[in-house]
Amino acid sequence: MTIAANLGFPRIGRRRELKTALERHWAGELDEAALLAEAARLSAVHWRCQQGLRINHVPSGDFSLYDHVLDTACMVGAIPPGYGWSGGPVTLSTFFALARGAHGTAALEMTKWFDTNYHYLVPRLSTAQQFQLTANRPLALYREARAVGLRTRPVLLGPVSFLLLSKTLDGSDPLDLLDRLLPIYRQVLRELAEEGVAWVQMDEPVLALDLSEKARIALALAYGALADGPAPDILLASYFGKLGDNLGTALRLPVAGLHLDLARGASDLDTVLEAPRPERWLSLGLVDGRNIWRADLRAALTTARRVAQAWGGTARIMIAPSCSLLHVPVDLDGEDRLDAELKPLLAFAVQKLREVAALARGLDEGEAAIKDELEASDRAARARATSARVNDPAVAARVGKAAPETEERTSTYAKRRERQRARLSLPAFPTTTIGSFPQTAEIRRARAAVGRGDMTAAEYERSIEGWIGEAVRWQEELGLDVLVHGEFERNDMVKYFGEQLRGFAFTRHGWVQSYGSRCVAPPIIWADVSRPEPITVRWAAYAQSLTDRPVKGMLTGPVTMLQWSFVRDDIPREQVCRQIALALRDEVTDLEAAGIAVIQVDEPAFREGLPLRRADWDAYLRWAVACFRVATAGVRDDTAIHTHMCYAEFNDIMAAIAAMDADAISIETTRSRMELLDAFAPGSGAAYPAEIGPGVWDIHSPRVPDTDEMAELLGLARGRLADWQIWVNPDCGLKTRKWEEVRPALANMVDAARRLRVRQAAVDRDGLPGDVGTAGSA
């Protein structure tokens, strides 16, 4: 019989119950016992839900109060110094201190989980690291499930992935700690076997990455050691991409089963079917666990049948999602306001598990057993392919006839710079902000009121005009050189634009976990994208009418809108991105026509889009750069195009950033004390040719830096860049800060820039050395 299996279920609950419980606990409104009771209740609800959906292998251990990588670190005793832990069970207060920081101790670093929009906490290890089993969490959760009537399949993050996803304090190779870590995993597996656990799922997602030979040897050593002792059957699971050149390693490991991501790694299947077949189970990830589209059940069933024929029947086949369903919302049934044409095309976690169960049944009993499911899948595919809304002929024609010249500015940057300087008349070290100002309780109340119908649209718009007017007056008084309107009308940097573009849709309850209690409801790009009317022009033009100083137009870039959405899967991502770029191009040129001389197109997710394998980077970077240029290249030479990127490793994509051909880029540099600028500096081998705004204020902290600190950071920037390149700005937008933090911090920032101008003028006049670094001055 084919096994219907799941790799992981969303943790947050249908109505974000986990978020509510966590935030009440952190606020002191819910004690530890009550929080743990709510976690146990949610887990039981999720287990019973999956059981009711006819899933044979229901996972346990996929639930977490914050992050599964942190759970693993705590289980194996990988607690760095400074958190008050001296061995034994890790308390909940220590767990949350690692996640969120406490009493002056910083939280662990957080970064993206592979190429998803989930974030994990990075374990910190050292060469002196000693591991210990603080508590057998998989065993405890298995027993918890048994208490409510289920035998589950415990899920563990594999030892090699755990180490490779960690960082060492001294820069040593985490894999050197494998011999010390393996006894902990062997003990966990032994105790699970003694409990009567039949299967355990060992996740090794690093198999989808470019691995060194040392890492491949580590996998062989690890699973050889785990097989040499009592243990349940191990299902080795990798996901997020093809195994490719790591497939041979995976096939040689002494495990009972292998899971394949056939949504993103379908090319692995032929190799697996051609390889020698020991008595191994094969788990087929036929239902995409990372997107929200209904599966093509007929095509998936055809693939499953091919495998069954090659595998000698269905006795050793599992059907599963491609990866954990952590990355999709819980249940589509609660979405009562979605477009009637869109909803039948979708599948959230619950619906995806129904698809898994249907495929398993169809493989065992034949097509007739799942006739209704197959017909519904076929209807959805036909409707999508023939819909005039999904496939807009006007958009297709525009994309098809866009000439290469669409991506090119009229002149080189050097010529544009002179014309922009003449138009803007800015001082040296011009000051600006990244775009948004604090979203106060008053703003949120007004937005909620207009949503409920308690405030008219006209009243709401008058309120926005009032906030913009106050912001413009205040920026003028402060002495900022290039102003912003404050983005008071915007709820979210992607949602705001998506709500006004054709082709986007939004859910009421389509929440997914970003990290901890932070949840996001990504837009759905379900149809061809176009702009029916201007989006931001009214507010930017209104702000500009209040001042003689330049006001920046503020847009979210095409790559970021793509990356932070659920993207249609019936056409290439590149094509979707180009559609967004053309829609934004219209907005950019309309802003210019309205008198806006500086237009910022933010791309904080530009680097996030990089594929997991380096061999695939160039193709992505080519179309990502092209789409940015399509969006921005339609303006005159004297209109400045700016962009903004968040904290990232820029060295390996500097050529692509330069190729975007923006007139200025602002980046997050405060925490690195300008070290990130090394990638942009003349000695880097790929010097950035245009202007740069290195952030001088860490806006992620409530702390207000003084003028001296900012001046010192600017001095460090001058040691790496020419003076003419440098803009002065915060690290990022100020939406999440409070006005009582913003006003003094920006006043200090303006003072730091003025101080720098005075010193530069003295040097230019008298040839005297300044007291800040000027190695890069020009």
Regions found by a protein language model. Give the residues of each.
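Domain-level signal for soluble alpha/beta catalytic cores
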Residues: M1-L768, G776-A778
